[in-house]
Amino acid sequence: MSRTLTLALSKGRILEETLPLLARCGIEPAEDPDASRKLIIGTNREDVRLLVVRASDVPTYVEHGGADLGVAGRDVLLEHGGDGLYDPVDLGIARCRLMVAGPPDGPPPGRRPRVATKFVHLARQHFAAQGRQAEIIKLYGSMELAPLVGMADLIVDLVDTGNTLRANGLAPLEEIMPISSRLVVNKASLKTSPDRLGTLIDDLAAAARAKDTS
């Protein structure tokens, strides 16, 4: 019997938008991942299972062989880095923008801005590319709170509709990059199971194209 392929996914929007693509490939979870407490979920195919992990951990599980492939946002992949990853397909799901945001008038002039974000590497890279010095403050959530309590002048975060920013008196100021979710593959797994993984990669790419044209 062939080895089971493991696909790492995170709960939330990525999972919600990946499941229809898997269904187009003939892969259905054996139970609802959102309702289940299980972290490893079988599918209707004996050779494919799902691994439910935190979004920021998807590339780590794939890089270190805990999963053969996964779905992660471009933001997570760029922040993570890593040489053991191959990202052959932009699935075009969970689209949003990585933005600099803050008070509508911008940061106070004449001093180095304090920037709250969980994307420390990408934020530092963005400001350095503009020749701007910034103090980066690492947070894991509720970025919008930092300017409200005077802890930061700006935030770098993912923005979809912008409703949360507006509700907290903030505005998008600069777009760093558009974001969508990509299929990411363990390079070693691709060498040991090229036919099976290659077929699944091609099927998911075709499903993503079909979604865009439907």
Swiss-Prot record:
It comes from the Bacteria. Keywords: Amino-acid biosynthesis, ATP-binding, Cytoplasm, Glycosyltransferase, Histidine biosynthesis, Nucleotide-binding, Transferase. Pfam families: HisG (PF01634). InterPro entries: ATP_PRibTrfase_cat (IPR013820), ATP_PRibTrfase_CS (IPR018198), ATP_PRibTrfase_HisG (IPR001348), ATP_PRibTrfase_HisG_short (IPR024893). Signal peptide: none annotated. PROSITE patterns: ATP_P_PHORIBOSYLTR. It is an enzyme of class 2 (transferase). It catalyses: 1-(5-phospho-beta-D-ribosyl)-ATP + diphosphate = 5-phospho-alpha-D-ribose 1-diphosphate + ATP. GO terms for cellular component: cytoplasm. The keyword Nucleotide-binding applies. GO terms for molecular function: ATP binding; ATP phosphoribosyltransferase activity. It is found in: Cytoplasm. Its EC number is 2.4.2.17. One of its GO terms (biological process) is L-histidine biosynthetic process. Its main location: cytoplasm. Pathway: Amino-acid biosynthesis; L-histidine biosynthesis; L-histidine from 5-phospho-alpha-D-ribose 1-diphosphate: step 1/9. Catalyzes the condensation of ATP and 5-phosphoribose 1-diphosphate to form N'-(5'-phosphoribosyl)-ATP (PR-ATP). Has a crucial role in the pathway because the rate of histidine biosynthesis seems to be controlled primarily by regulation of HisG enzymatic activity. Lacks the C-terminal regulatory region which is replaced by HisZ. Belongs to the ATP phosphoribosyltransferase family. Short subfamily. NCBIfam families: hisG. Heteromultimer composed of HisG and HisZ subunits. This is ATP phosphoribosyltransferase. It comes from Halorhodospira halophila (strain DSM 244 / SL1).
